[in-house]
Amino acid sequence: NVITGLNNLQELPRFLIFMHEAVRLCTESSTLLPTLQLLQKRGCSLRICEHSVQKLSLNDEIKVGHVVSTHLILEICLKSEKVIRF
């Protein structure tokens, strides 16, 4: 798994952005929750798309990261030197 492999890196990405169905990875039922919590603790900023969270009715289930607007996600992507998408 790519996300699990990130914890083996010395230098982490500045941001991980979760959109669409990927927002489910940030919920309590996700098997990746401990990995994401560790990435966040190590300094990786986790951003979760507010629109996706609302569309999937997961408002009260997000347990890691910060729920942000689509506009802010777009700003992050436009200001980044590199964007890798999975």
Feature roles, as predicted:
Residues 1, 30-34, 65-67:
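Charged helix-capping and loop-helix junction motifs
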Residues 1-29:
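Conserved mixed alpha/beta catalytic, RNA-binding, or beta-rich assembly cores of soluble enzyme
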Residues 3, 33-37, 74:
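Short amphipathic alpha-helical segments and helix-helix/interface helices
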Residues 13, 43, 64, 80-81:
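Short, well-ordered alpha-helix to beta-strand connector turns
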Residues 32-58:
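A glycine-rich helix N-cap at a beta->alpha junction
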Residues 61-71:
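Active-site regions of enzymes building and remodeling cell-envelope glycoconjugates
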